[in-house]
Every structure is written in structure tokens, then in C-alpha cells.
Regions:
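Surface-exposed beta-strand/loop patches in extracellular or lumenal glycoproteins
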Residues: 11-36, 227-237
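Terminal connector regions
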Residues: 87-115
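Beta-strand/loop-rich accessory regions of lumenal/periplasmic or secreted enzymes
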Residues: 69, 106-398
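Solvent-exposed beta-strand/loop surfaces of large extracellular or lumenal domains
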Residues: 37, 42-66, 397
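Solvent-exposed beta-hairpin/edge-strand motifs
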Residues: 28-47, 234-251
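Conserved structural-core and active-site-/substrate-pathway-adjacent residues in large, well-folded domains
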Residues: 40, 77-79, 117, 215
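Short beta-strand elements of extracellular/lumenal beta-sandwich folds
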Residues: 2-17, 214-220
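Short Pro-Gly-centered flexible turn/kink motifs
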Residues: 74-85, 395-398
Length: 398
């Protein structure tokens, strides 16, 4: 069979926008068509993009059967091309220039990953292993951790016990020029028992601000005595701007978003000014307060600040969204819909954190929480099992 040096690729899912995004994919090769594994580039109309390549399987004759690839994929269809057009030559193994992922292991056991725009410090022995995230040198997130709770009985009124989630090991599972995978291992501790061994993989890609997390958990507890009541990933967000320059985004259904500020300046009885309103709606910095209409600037302290938002997808057919000004204040219904796309963002003029859960509405009961938005330390939580839902009951049904 003739040797192949390229193959066409087609996106299976439509993608909005034109920016390249991190991706991992596999390519099958006919028997004998790829004797060795070269470096590859993704090539489209805008140019070529390097990707990491590894052999996932071989044919009995030793030729490559499957290759795995990771990097930033272009927004449209592309071709996977051997870096020099000739697979298996010495030239294909030479280092390539451009943005690469840098990773280092520190003396204290922490792991420092830098994609060129995103820096992540992972401290496996901390209670919050995602110590901090920086974008372009600015701190945007800190103290990221898994959280969970359970009950000893299945009733909705049963007392809930907070789990202590411990990370016991961390290491670099795959190190490439374009992508690094960090593997965290640990377990939960509850009521004196060690349960739920888990693996959390973090994928960081060169030139990207995105950090992908894949969580795997083994259920090894007694289903007759342990009922999971919540399981989620939380990231704290430092907030430095004034409340009217802090912003919240929550994804609804069919591409819609709830877009609000912590202290809203639109729809008021008094108008702060068109420039102020337009800036806040756009998520940009508002003009100095002194330039606002005095009827608003003098009464700014009377405009409520919203502290918490919750989006609950408790069935595949509908979600509800509510918000409140403080923990001792009532929840105010804000929106509802069918199938949320499962994304939440909290940030200010210095940056913020957006978290999304793939197949959000298919994994019900799920939930997104934004908390502490009116304080100096907010948080975004993605719930794999919503705390507002009934406890997870894994007992045999008869």
C-alpha cells in the first residue's frame, strides 16, 4: 500500500466563532500505510497549526493503526498533514517553533503549567489542589477543589454530611509541546470511612485560556447506608472592581444567556446616562461615578447588589434560575427554560472564571451556582449531582 502523508478531517459538531479551541482526537490508518509516526500539522485555509501526536495502536506488521492528536483545532474542516510531507524522516522529529506548553515540578510537590496565556499552579497536597489560575499575569481564579456531601438515609430531610475530599497523588500523565495532561488521584472521607477513589485529569493546551477537567469516580460505598447528596467542582474568583463593574453570565437554552451586573444600572427610575448603560450592557468599564447623572450617583448605595445565582436543571425538560441579594434573603425567580447549555461565568474588569459542563441537561440532576458576587471573593460551582435534588439512591430496586 502507498504511504500516506495526509488525511482529511471533518468537524462532527458545529462550532460557533472563528477562534481555534483545544481538542483531542484519533485518526485510523490503513494497514501498512503509515510505517512510522511523524509529527503532524493541522492545515486549513488560514495556515498550519502543530499538534502533538502519539501512537495509540499498531497493526500486526508494526505499522501504525491509530494515532492520537492534541492541540488547538481550527474552526472549520482541515487536513492532518505530516509536518514535512514525508512521514518517518529525521526532519519530522525536530522541535518546532511557536507557543508551547511549559511545565515544571516544584520542590514542594506542586506542578506549574504555563500555556503562554494561562498559568495554572496545582498543589496536590492542599485542600484545594487548583491553587491559582492566572491569565496574562492576572489572578482570575484560586482554591479550586472538589466538594461533596452525603446522607445516611435517602429521605430529602436527612442530615447531610460534608465530605473531606483529599488529593493524595499528582503527576504529569502526558507531556507534549502542544498539550500537557496532569493526573490527580484521591479519595473522599466521610463518617470515618475512606470511599470514592477518584481521578481528576487536567488538560492544558498551548496558546489557550481553557483548562479542561475530566473527573472519574469509583463508587465503592455501601448503597444501603450512603446516599450522595452533592458532587461538584468549585473555583473561587477574586473580585476587585466595583459591584457595577462585576458581571454574571449563565447559559440558557437555544443559545440564550442571562447577562447581568452585580449592581444593575439599567431599568432604574433615574437614568445614569446612556454611556453608563451601554458600557455595563457590553461588559465594559463604566465611566467614573462622578460623571453619572447626580440623581443616580448620590443614591448608588441604595441600588441592591445581587450576591448569588443558581441554575437548577433537575429534569431533562426544564431548568429554573433564581437570584438573591444575601444568604438570609429570599430567592427571586429570574428565568426558566428547557435545556440549559450548562455554562456560568463570574468576573470583573480584571478577568473572571467561566465553567461549563458538557452534556449538562443530559446528566440531570445538575446545577450551576454563582456565590459571593457582592464580596471580595466570589465562587463558581458546577454540580455533577445537584444539592437541590433528591439524594442519589443506588439500592437495588426490588
Amino acid at each position: 500500500m502507498p504511504r500516506l502523508t495526509e488525511t482529511p478531517l471533518q468537524l462532527l459538531e458545529p462550532r460557533t466563532g472563528t477562534a481555534a479551541v483545544p481538542t483531542q482526537f484519533g485518526v485510523p490508518w490503513p494497514r501498512g500505510a503509515m510505517p512510522q509516526s511523524p509529527q503532524f500539522d493541522l492545515v486549513d485555509a488560514s495556515g498550519s497549526t502543530p499538534v502533538d501526536t502519539w501512537v495509540a495502536a499498531r497493526w500486526p506488521d508494526g505499522s501504525v493503526k491509530w494515532t492520537g492528536h492534541a492541540g488547538c483545532a481550527p474552526a472549520g474542516d482541515a487536513r492532518l498533514v505530516a509536518a514535512d510531507g514525508k512521514e518517518g524522516t529525521a526532519a519530522t522529529t525536530a522541535p518546532r517553533t511557536g507557543v508551547v506548553v511549559e511545565v515544571s515540578e516544584q520542590a514542594d510537590g506542586s506542578i506549574d503549567v504555563d500555556t503562554g496565556v494561562l498559568r495554572v499552579v496545582i498543589a496536590p497536597h492542599d485542600g484545594a489542589p487548583l491553587r491559582h489560575l492566572e491569565v496574562d499575569g492576572r489572578l482570575v481564579g484560586q482554591d479550586g477543589r472538589l466538594i461533596a456531601s452525603s446522607a445516611a438515609s435517602p429521605g430529602s430531610g436527612a442530615s447531610r454530611r460534608e465530605h473531606r475530599v483529599r488529593t493524595t497523588a499528582a503527576g504529569i500523565e502526558r507531556r507534549g509541546e502542544q498539550q500537557v495532561v496532569v493526573r490527580l488521584e484521591g479519595h473522599h472521607e466521610v463518617a470515618g470511612e475512606r470511599v470514592f477513589p477518584f481521578v481528576l485529569r487536567l488538560y492544558a493546551t498551548a496558546g489557550s485560556r481553557r483548562l479542561r477537567a475530566v473527573h472519574s469516580l469509583v463508587w465503592d460505598a455501601d448503597p444501603e447506608s450512603l446516599f450522595l447528596t452533592s458532587l461538584g467542582l468549585r473555583m473561587e474568583v477574586p473580585l476587585r472592581s466595583a459591584p457595577h463593574d462585576r458581571h454574571v453570565r449563565l447559559a440558557g437554552s437555544e443559545g440564550g444567556f442571562l447577562t447581568e451586573a452585580v449592581r444593575g444600572l439599567t431599568g432604574l427610575r433615574r437614568d445614569p446616562g446612556a454611556e453608563v448603560r451601554e458600557a455595563q450592557i457590553a461588559g465594559a468599564a463604566t465611566p467614573p461615578v462622578e460623571s453619572w447623572a447626580p440623581e443616580v450617583s448620590r443614591r448608588l448605595h441604595l441600588i441592591p447588589t445581587w450576591n448569588d445565582w443558581t441554575l437548577r436543571q433537575l429534569s431533562a425538560h426544564g431548568y429554573t434560575l433564581a437570584k438573591r441579594t444575601a444568604g438570609d434573603r429570599p430567592w427571586i425567580p429570574a428565568a426558566s427554560g428547557t435545556r440549559s447549555q450548562g455554562y456560568a461565568y463570574l468576573g470583573d474588569l480584571e478577568g473572571g472564571i467561566g465553567m461549563g459542563l458538557r452534556d449538562f441537561w443530559k446528566l440531570v440532576p445538575t446545577q450551576l451556582d454563582i456565590t459571593g458576587a457582592a464580596t471580595e471573593h466570589g465562587a463558581v460551582t458546577t454540580w455533577l449531582h445537584a444539592p437541590s435534588a433528591e439524594p442519589m439512591d443506588l439500592r437495588f430496586y426490588h
